[in-house]
C-alpha cells in the first residue's frame, strides 16, 4: 500500500472500496514502520476484474443542511432588555446620557415595529452536492486494467463556498505465471475551492437582532451604531459579501505508484515500491 493524506480518502469513490482495516500498535509498526506506531487505517480498493469489458457509472447526491439547534440566542426584545439591565444606556455624563437615551428609543421603536432579525440564517443555505464516477475495467489472467473518471461538486452551507474536484485514474497490472506481478496506478486530480465571501460566522452570531438587514428602500444597510455613545460603527456582515474580493484555491496533483512482486518460491518473496507525486498550485 501507499501512504496518502486524509483528503485522498475523502475523495475516494465509496463504491470502489473493498475493505477498511484498522491496525494498532505493534502490528501497524511491524508492517509500516515507526510512523505507524499510533495506528494505521488500511483502505483496500477493488482490483480490476478479468473478463469482458465492463463499464459502470455511479451518481451520489448529498444534501447538507446547517444545524443551528445548539445556538440559544436572545430575540430582539430580550436582547434590548438585557442591555438595559446591564446598564448600557446609563452614563454619568449628561451629553452621553442623552445620546444613549436616543439610541435606546430608536431601538425600542424598531422592536415594537416587529424587527427581529435572525442573523444566524443569513449567510447559510441548504447545499446539494453531487458525485459522478465512471469506471471501465477488463483484461485477462495476465493483464488487467481499470480507468476511472470522476467529478465532485461540493457546495458548502456557507453561501458561495464550494469545493469541486475532477479526477482521472489509470491502473494497469501484469501477472506473469503467478511469479512476477507488476502494478502501476496513475492518478491526476484537479481541485478548486472557494471560501464564502460572507465572512466569519461568528460575526452573525454577535449581530444584534434589533438591527434590520435592509433600509426602507430595500437597500442593504452598510453599518450600524455601536453600543457606546460615539460615532463608531460596525459593518453589516452581509454588506461585506457585496465587496469585490475572492478567496480561492486551485491545484493539480499527479501521483504515480508502481510496485513489483517476485514470488521466488514458497518461502521467499521480493517486493519493491516506487511512488512519485507532484502538486502545482
Where are these regions (language model features)?
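Residues embedded in well-ordered regular secondary structure
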Residues: 1-3, 39, 47-159, 197-200, ...
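Short acidic/polar hinge/loop motifs at secondary-structure boundaries
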Residues: 1-24
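Short beta-alpha junctions and helix-cap segments that line functional grooves
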Residues: 5-8, 27-31, 41
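GHKL/Bergerat-fold ATPase module in large chromosome/replication-associated machines
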Residues: 221-223
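Transmembrane beta-barrel strand/turn architecture of Gram-negative outer membrane proteins
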Residues: 16-18, 36-63, 142-215, 245-281
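Glycine-rich phosphate/dinucleotide-binding loop and adjoining beta-alpha-beta core of small-molecule
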Residues: 229-231
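Non-catalytic, largely sequence-independent nucleic-acid-binding elements associated
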Residues: 5, 225-227
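Conserved catalytic network of the ASCE P-loop NTPase/AAA+ motor domain
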Residues: 12, 34-35
Amino acid at each position: 500500500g501507499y501512504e496518502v493524506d486524509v483528503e485522498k480518502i475523502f475523495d475516494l469513490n465509496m463504491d470502489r472500496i473493498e475493505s477498511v482495516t484498522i491496525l494498532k500498535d505493534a502490528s501497524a509498526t511491524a508492517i509500516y514502520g515507526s510512523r505507524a506506531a499510533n495506528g494505521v487505517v488500511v483502505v483496500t480498493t477493488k482490483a480490476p476484474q478479468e473478463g469482458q469489458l465492463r463499464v459502470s457509472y455511479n451518481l451520489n447526491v448529498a444534501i447538507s443542511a446547517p444545524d443551528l439547534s445548539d445556538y440559544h440566542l436572545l430575540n430582539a426584545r430580550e436582547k434590548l432588555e438585557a442591555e438595559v439591565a446591564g446598564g448600557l444606556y446609563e452614563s454619568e455624563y449628561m451629553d452621553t446620557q442623552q445620546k444613549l437615551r436616543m439610541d435606546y428609543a430608536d431601538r425600542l421603536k424598531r422592536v415594537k415595529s416587529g424587527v427581529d432579525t435572525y442573523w444566524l440564517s443569513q449567510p447559510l443555505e441548504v447545499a446539494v452536492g453531487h458525485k459522478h464516477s465512471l469506471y471501465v475495467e477488463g483484461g485477462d489472467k495476465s493483464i488487467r486494467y481499470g480507468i476511472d473518471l470522476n467529478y465532485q461538486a461540493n457546495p458548502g452551507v456557507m453561501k458561495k463556498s464550494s469545493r469541486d474536484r475532477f479526477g482521472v485514474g489509470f491502473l494497469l497490472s501484469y501477472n506473469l505465471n503467478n511469479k512476477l506481478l507488476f502494478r502501476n496506478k496513475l492518478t491526476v486530480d484537479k481541485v478548486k475551492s472557494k471560501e464564502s465571501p460572507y465572512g466569519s460566522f461568528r460575526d452573525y452570531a454577535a449581530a444584534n437582532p434589533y438591527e434590520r438587514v435592509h433600509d426602507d428602500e430595500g437597500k442593504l444597510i452598510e453599518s450600524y451604531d455601536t453600543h457606546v455613545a460615539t460615532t463608531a460603527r460596525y459593518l453589516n456582515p452581509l454588506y461585506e459579501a457585496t465587496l469585490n474580493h475572492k478567496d480561492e484555491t486551485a491545484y493539480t496533483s499527479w501521483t504515480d505508484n508502481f510496485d513489483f512482486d517476485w514470488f521466488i518460491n514458497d518461502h521467499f518473496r521480493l517486493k519493491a515500491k516506487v511512488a512519485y507525486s507532484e502538486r502545482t498550485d
